[in-house]
Amino acid sequence: MIMSLRLNDLKPALGASSCRARVGRGIGSGLGKTAGRGHKGSFARKGGGKIKPGFEGGQTPMQRRLPKIGFRSRSVANTAEVLSYKLDNLEPGEIDFASLRLAKLVPSTAKKAKIVKKGRLTKVFVLKGIESTAGARAMIETTGGSFQE
């Protein structure tokens, strides 16, 4: 006789699953009275053990003991750095923020660009409305380029 296996006949292997512990049901159960929570303290209370991050038991927490130092400038997040040697890949002439974005030298999230000196520059550029470091400005001007605000 061949028995077919059906979904309603499936059950876990013997000893693979155990019943949920029913706590607070008398001393004979092993989990009566305090229900495995011990005596008193925060862990014995409902919602116990849930403490705020950084809480040190009433002691002044670390984030209040240490001094507040520095900050992150928002303008840095909106400014993209363009290395000066990458400008040599562009055609010589006028360069503005839109042309840098078209050349994919500036990400779409940036609101302004700044030229940083790195490498050499051989072509002549006229930069419109683009910031630069002192070294990059000197390098662009020595090649015959200029800046327009």
UniProtKB/Swiss-Prot annotation:
Q: One MF term from GO for this chain? A: structural constituent of ribosome
Q: Does the record bear Endoplasmic reticulum in its keywords?
A: no
Cysteine pairs bridged by disulfides in the record? none
Could you tell me which Gene3D superfamilies the record lists for this protein? Answer: 3.100.10.10
Q: Which Pfam families match?
A: Ribosomal_L27A
Region (Disordered) residue spans: 30-63
Compositional bias ranges of the Basic residues kind: 36-49
GO cellular component terms, A-Z: cytosolic large ribosomal subunit
InterPro entries of this UniProt entry? Ribosomal_uL15, Ribosomal_uL15/eL18, Ribosomal_uL15/eL18_sf, Ribosomal_uL15_bac-type
For the keyword Nucleus, the answer is no
Q: Which superkingdom is the protein from?
A: Bacteria
| Keywords of the record | Ribonucleoprotein, Ribosomal protein, RNA-binding, rRNA-binding
A biological process (GO) annotation for this entry? translation
Q: Which family does it belong to?
A: Belongs to the universal ribosomal protein uL15 family.
Subunit notes for this chain? Answer: Part of the 50S ribosomal subunit.
Task: Show the NCBIfam families listed in the entry.
Answer: rplO_bact
* Function, as annotated: Binds to the 23S rRNA.
The protein depicted here goes by the name: Large ribosomal subunit protein uL15
What is the native source organism of this protein? Xylella fastidiosa (strain 9a5c)
